[in-house]
Amino acid sequence: MNTSFIQALLVASRRFGIQCLIQVMFGLTAMGFASLALAETSRLEKVLQNKELRACIWPEYYSITYRNPKTRELSGIDIALTQELAKELGVKVRYVDSNFSQLYDALEQDRCDVATHAIGITAERLARLQFSQAYLKSGLFAVTLKNKDGLQSWDSLDQPGRVIAVAAGTLMEGIMAKSLKKAKLVKVQAPGTREQEVLSGRADAFMTDYPYSLRMIELTDWAAVIPAPNNMPTTEYAYAFAKGDNSLLLRVEAFLSNVKKDGRLLQYAKQHNLDPIVVLK
């Protein structure tokens, strides 16, 4: 307490009596303890108290957090892993639809406790978010029309007159903005899709990663996939959390270490054809 505050209390005690002073001090002490208790309720404690883990997902992310448009059922490695995590915590998972352009708002505005849709670790994101250890790692893939004239290799992408589409907010946006020298880069905002840009002819190709390229190969009959050369960057994927409290992050870290050791991560990666990009160490 500062000097002026103490002097004010002494004046109050002389004017209204010592009993009043005691009551005031008791009230201030109670308020202080209440504030302290509130401040010490960690993210993990809230999850446990509410019996609910709010996990942000991108329901278009094939083999990661994909919602089947016909059955509305969710599947993917991160659906399986979050169910395992929830089981260990003794809570249920509530999946919150999101996407990469909403990533910061979803976490910072407390719409979810953790983003669990294979978030690529980038310098920009590290400045605003906390990340778990990596569990996947992917390079880039270009998706174009089968037998499209002049588009058979990676080198044919960055040419004058070419249009390359990326989903806004994805790590591909930053990578391609730096690497493209001749082609035009188009950022696609939801509800628009990269596929629509290519199918309509507005773009020659769109950029994606290994998991999403599986969707194009397995669910379409028009897509050709071109992998990036070895000199292009790869990105590690992890779970993301808002800055500040790290209690849930530490618990997820322990969980990821365990599923790497006991084989569950590799098991789920194989189930969803992601074993070529799984990170086990």
Pin down the residues of each PLM region.
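Periplasmic-binding protein-like
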Residues: 59, 136-144, 210, 214-257, ...
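Ligand-binding clefts/hinges and TM-proximal coupling segments of bilobed small-molecule sensing domains
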Residues: 41, 171-186, 224-228, 257-281
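Ligand-binding cleft/hinge of the Venus flytrap
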Residues: 65-71, 82-91, 154-158, 172-189, ...
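Short helix-initiation/N-cap motifs at beta->coil->alpha
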Residues: 79, 95-105, 152, 186-196, ...
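A ligand-binding cleft/hinge motif common to bilobed small-molecule-binding domains
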Residues: 102-105, 119-127, 175-178, 199-233
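Flexible hinge/capping segments at coil-to-helix
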Residues: 145-162
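Extracytoplasmic small-molecule ligand-binding "clamshell" domains
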Residues: 40-118, 127, 271
